[in-house]
Design a protein with these regions (language model features):
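Non-catalytic connector elements of ABC transporters
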Residues: 240, 250-362
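The feature captures the beta-strand-to-loop junction immediately N-terminal to the Walker
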Residues: 38-40
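ABC ATPase nucleotide-binding domains
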Residues: 34, 79-81, 85, 89-235
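Conserved coupling/switch loops of ABC nucleotide-binding domains, chiefly the family-specific signature
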Residues: 59-62, 112, 212, 244
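ABC ATPase nucleotide-binding domain helices that frame the ATP-binding cleft
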Residues: 46-49, 145
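Helix-to-loop junction immediately C-terminal to a conserved catalytic motif
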Residues: 53
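Conserved ABC transporter NBD signature motif
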Residues: 61-69
Length: 362
């Protein structure tokens, strides 16, 4: 990108006593993008968001907004409203008074703030609830009020800290669609913290994956899904079979990965790896094939016994175990599994093309 980033973290770290919550971080966030920061509990994602919001002060480094350092700028002067999981709505105010509140604090006149609040309630599809108290609303309706309250001030950037985690599955999916549509229509930069892969991948333009206070990978959902950079990312996403091993040469001089359950051919371009180097081969569970016998000409095949099956809607996930005790899984549409004679305890051969493998560093 040629323009300057809307937000930049330069060497930003956060320590609480002897504990480092965020190690030195460099991150650029661009105008108009939907950025998701994802990771398990304690990875530093919420601390990162709170530093941007002005609720935590960096221990070192500089945070810039529109090119200007904001480390010493109080939260109320940053134009970075935040939506929390708890929503933090005022129960003693009506719906429209909640939406008006930030405008009132900014000195906007009564008529103008009422007009803008009504516009956002209409936009969020909750205009009919303007006079109700917060306690009379459903979870999804409260979520829309919280969004309207944050967006009515027309910020450059909106921060969201796991705002959908308390909603049921169906409502969560609907709200994901609402959020993405709002972001596209307004052009406001969204920074969204979550532990949910489905939320991050369905909405974000780019995803940041964090672990133990460090960024593991930044990229589009497609790039991260297809090509995780590290063993941690592959494990965290949970969509790949992982074969840990070392780079070696087979009897024909070809570069392979030697693992406890066999030697496997590598994708093109892997010859540059050094023999003996510890790596892992990842293969998406959707790219694995199931057969009664070793497929003729297959370079990568491993025998395994079926140990379980999980119904996941339009697809099924079949679980296998190798003789060495490694669990593998295959995910396929139901129609692709109908003629395989699947049964718990039965032995099969799992295979994949070398081009479907991906090497990650340990």
């Amino acid at each position: 990108m040629t323009q300057d980033p809307l937000v930049s973290f330069a060497g930003v770290a956060k320590r609480f006593g002897a504990y480092t919550a965020v190690h030195r971080m460099d991150l650029d966030i661009w105008q108009g993008e939907f950025l998701a920061i994802m990771g398990s509990s304690g990875c530093g994602k919420t601390t990162t968001l709170r530093m941007l919001a002005g609720l935590e002060a960096p221990s070192e480094g500089v945070i810039r907004l529109s090119g200007k350092p904001i480390n010493d700028l109080p939260s109320w002067r940053r134009d970075t409203p935040m939506v929390w999981q708890s929503l933090a709505l005022f129960p003693f105010l009506s719906v429209i008074e909640n939406v008006e509140f930030a405008l009132k604090m900014r000195g906007v006149g009564r008529a103008e703030r009422r007009r803008r609040a009504e516009q956002w309630l209409e936009r969020m599809g909750i205009a009919e609830f303007a006079g109700r108290s917060i306690g009379q609303l459903s979870g999804g309706q409260r979520q829309r009020v919280a969004l309207a309250r944050s967006l009515v001030v027309e910020p450059q950037i909106l921060l969201l800290d796991e705002p959908l985690s308390a909603l049921d599955a169906a409502l969560k999916v609907r709200m994901q669609s609402v959020l993405k549509q709002l972001q596209r229509e307004t052009g406001i930069t969204f920074v969204y913290v979550t532990h949910s892969q489905s939320e991050a991948f369905s909405m974000a333009d780019r995803v940041v994956i964090m672990s133990r206070g460090r960024i593991e990978q930044i990229g589009t959902p497609q790039d991260i899904y297809r090509a995780p950079l590290t063993r941690f990312v592959a494990d965290f996403l949970g969509s790949s079979n992982i074969f840990p091993g070392r780079i070696a040469r087979d009897g024909q001089g070809r570069t392979v990965i030697a693992t406890p359950i066999g030697d496997f051919a590598l994708p093109a371009g892997a010859d540059a790896e050094s023999p003996g180097q510890a790596v892992s081969l990842t293969v998406l569970d959707t790219r694995m094939q199931i057969a009664d016998h070793p497929p003729q000409g297959a370079l990568n095949s491993v025998p395994a016994r079926m140990v379980g099956e999980e119904f996941t809607g339009a697809t099924a996930t079949i679980y296998f175990e190798t003789e060495a005790g490694q669990e593998l899984r295959v995910q396929k549409p139901h129609q692709d599994l109908a003629d395989l004679g699947l049964a718990i305890g039965r032995s099969f051969h799992l295979s994949w093309a070398p081009s479907d493998g991906h090497l990650v560093r340990e």
